[in-house]
Amino acid sequence: MASSILSSAAVASVNSASPAQASMVAPFTGLKSSAGFPITRKNNVDITTLASNAGKVQCMKVWPPLGLRKFETLSYLPDMSNEQLSKECDYLLRNGWVPCVEFDIGSGFVYRENHRSPGFYDGRYWTMWKLPMFGCTDSSQVIQEIEEAKKEYPDAFIRVIGFDNVRQVQCISFIAYKPQVLLFLSSIC
């Protein structure tokens, strides 16, 4: 009997507290119906009056699929001279990265042949020319290795990567040599 009295008193206290709490919180009035406001609207279906994020549309040409192949980040630039290669290698060494010379006898660019998943590309990993040049302090040593690789594989693409052995990531990569066969392939593609 006492439990039933206690429970009904508890329900009564909850019911009496509910209206007080509801009156303390203001009702949400952020969204209002526009049905009550008379609006005169003209039926204009001209697409030029639609809202836009730009004044005029600028069309940009995409990368042409024939004749111009992209290899690395700045591969659209002309081939680098030995002086420019030396400056790039100096930059690489100045940042404390380990130079590594790599070559690819194939096409020299990434492609999909063995797997069709979006993140997988064949041709991303090239063959190392020799071991990474740990302890290299002069860009002329890197240029000498590039020249040796060109003599050994004249029809191969040669690139230099800069490896940060502390973070264990590749920080820079650039094409040091493109074979003359590329000119022929570009003209027939």
From Swiss-Prot:
<keyword id="KW-0602">Photosynthesis</keyword>
<dbReference type="GO" id="GO:0009853">
    <property type="term" value="P:photorespiration"/>
</dbReference>
<keyword id="KW-0113">Calvin cycle</keyword>
<keyword id="KW-0601">Photorespiration</keyword>
<keyword id="KW-0934">Plastid</keyword>
<dbReference type="Pfam" id="PF12338">
    <property type="entry name" value="RbcS"/>
</dbReference>
<keyword id="KW-0809">Transit peptide</keyword>
<protein>
    <recommendedName>
        <fullName>Ribulose bisphosphate carboxylase small subunit, chloroplastic</fullName>
    </recommendedName>
</protein>
<comment type="subunit">
    <text>Heterohexadecamer of 8 large and 8 small subunits.</text>
</comment>
<comment type="similarity">
    <text>Belongs to the RuBisCO small chain family.</text>
</comment>
<keyword id="KW-0120">Carbon dioxide fixation</keyword>
<dbReference type="GO" id="GO:0016984">
    <property type="term" value="F:ribulose-bisphosphate carboxylase activity"/>
</dbReference>
<dbReference type="GO" id="GO:0009507">
    <property type="term" value="C:chloroplast"/>
</dbReference>
<dbReference type="InterPro" id="IPR000894">
    <property type="entry name" value="RuBisCO_ssu_dom"/>
</dbReference>
<dbReference type="InterPro" id="IPR036385">
    <property type="entry name" value="RuBisCO_ssu_sf"/>
</dbReference>
<comment type="function">
    <text>RuBisCO catalyzes two reactions: the carboxylation of D-ribulose 1,5-bisphosphate, the primary event in carbon dioxide fixation, as well as the oxidative fragmentation of the pentose substrate. Both reactions occur simultaneously and in competition at the same active site. Although the small subunit is not catalytic it is essential for maximal activity.</text>
</comment>
<keyword id="KW-0150">Chloroplast</keyword>
<dbReference type="InterPro" id="IPR024680">
    <property type="entry name" value="RuBisCO_ssu_N"/>
</dbReference>
<feature type="transit peptide" description="Chloroplast">
    <location>
        <begin position="1"/>
        <end position="58"/>
    </location>
</feature>
<dbReference type="InterPro" id="IPR024681">
    <property type="entry name" value="RuBisCO_ssu"/>
</dbReference>
<dbReference type="GO" id="GO:0019253">
    <property type="term" value="P:reductive pentose-phosphate cycle"/>
</dbReference>
<dbReference type="Pfam" id="PF00101">
    <property type="entry name" value="RuBisCO_small"/>
</dbReference>
